[in-house]
Amino acid sequence: MTGKIVFATGNAGKMKEIRLILADLGMEIYSMKEAGIQTEVEENGTTFEENAVLKAKAIGEQTDAIVLADDSGLEVDYLNKEPGVYSARYLGEDTSYRIKNQSLIDRLDGVPEEKRTARFVCAIAAHLPDGRMLTTRGTIEGIIGYEERGEGGFGYDPIFYLPEYGCSTAELSMEKKNELSHRGKALRAMKEELKKALEA
């Protein structure tokens, strides 16, 4: 099987995380841009898994590499698990995360800590050159903070607070974030699935 993986993202932060976690597979890992693939896939699934599979399949049909795609988002329990699969599109795709984060803080104004529970969810799909599809999921539980904290991370990280660590995910070191994060968990699970699939 091919020694090449294409990850369906243009996000530099994600690529850094992915390369760190999948390094010991001993495969070359490319972003879509690096692989010269420019497909826009409409993410119209109703679950994170459906969206990841849609992306992996659409891009997998254009290359003989293994294609990994993820869909991830934030579920806030008090807001009926919003923004969920619409996390990237919440308040519009071009809206800055500073505005998105402030909106969620405002919507939880006056809500006590025990009702501010939330989780990051990440589903990853792998489309193999022989047409097989693998999926994994990872989650991390936390609460929505009262303000943005930390300069690391991206997206909703500054308002996602981990009580047991006393900080937001934007305040974690890259190593700790990879260990704890939803994407880190889903990627490590996918790494094991890929090892099994490549041996088969």
Predicted features, each with a name:
Residues 2-6, 12-200:
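Anionic-ligand binding patches
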